[in-house]
Amino acid sequence: MIRIAIDCMGGDFGLPVTIPAAIEFARQFPDSRLLLVGLPEAIEAALAEHKAAPRDRFEIVPATEVVSMDDPVEIALRRKKDSSMRLAAQAVKDGRADACVSAGNTGAWMAISRYVLKTLDGIDRPAIATSIPNQTGRATTVLDLGANVDCTAEHLLQFAIMGTALTQAVDHRDNPTVGLLNIGEEVIKGNEVVKEAAELLRRSPLNFRGNVEGNDIFKGTVDVVVCDGFVGNVVLKSVEGLAKMLSSVIREEFQRNLVTLLAGAIAKPVLNRLRNRVDNRRYNGAALLGLRGVVIKSHGSADVYAYGFALQRAREAVVSKLQERTAQAVALITQRVQMGEAAAGEPEAAGDTV
């Protein structure tokens, strides 16, 4: 039985999204059990609206506090110790759940998850990673997407290690290619942090292909694209906004007159396939990598359909043993990186110089 703890109160909409999504998920995956974490009376009232809810697959975990979307991290972490967000992460720590999911405040979710679960050896900060569809029919793993606004070159190297480990574990790619997001491919481009990170990546055993630009994400030029959380979040929100805009424009154009309506009817199968490929809701659910447990971040604005995919991401992570495999890969790659750095720092033996 796969056990997933849900922060039912988190996100822009809270219970009106999380409870229906949990019910549909439970129906779809009978091998799963859900811990519904939040204000118990509110959860009971939300469940009562769905008479056919599989109640035997749910366990309500009572919380007395809720982390709002605008709560400062310090408040969420230090004062709201009985929040639904905190208790969802604690359920994983205590072994009551195999994974936890929240659509709440990103900064608070990262801080709480990091505090409760701790980071893997060799990792200073967790990073948010997700898959963005590309023209090859596969997907590009991009991280960080907002967990770390300010990063050092060493942090970017660690993100590359985690992204490589994730791609190996989930996409089964033996030697994933890595690119560093920059304003150009040339080595002279970028700020000092990016330049230093590129040098660290070049000296590492990772399959680093150099700097990449934003359009390379959609070309599928590399398997993993690394950037700081500020840039990554802007990229992600831009992609989502563009997808929604294109969907709206296409719909408007096909509804313009009778001829376009007929053309739309003929093109409907193609349009449906296109929508499925680019619908950002189907890619909802980003993994918070680098922790000693499976943590999934849903979009705060996710609807029921999108939140269901975040729950599926959590289930897939458990089934594929993502956390264990990522921990093993991170340990192995980190060791290789450290060995490479040690070798690079050794003085030349006498007689080797010309």
UniProtKB/Swiss-Prot annotation:
This is Phosphate acyltransferase. GO terms for cellular component: cytoplasm. HAMAP family: PlsX. Pathway: Lipid metabolism; phospholipid metabolism. The keyword Metal-binding does not apply. It comes from Bordetella petrii (strain ATCC BAA-461 / DSM 12804 / CCUG 43448). One of its GO terms (molecular function) is phosphate:acyl-[acyl carrier protein] acyltransferase activity. It is found in: Cytoplasm. Keywords: Cytoplasm, Lipid biosynthesis, Lipid metabolism, Phospholipid biosynthesis, Phospholipid metabolism, Transferase. Pfam families: FA_synthesis.
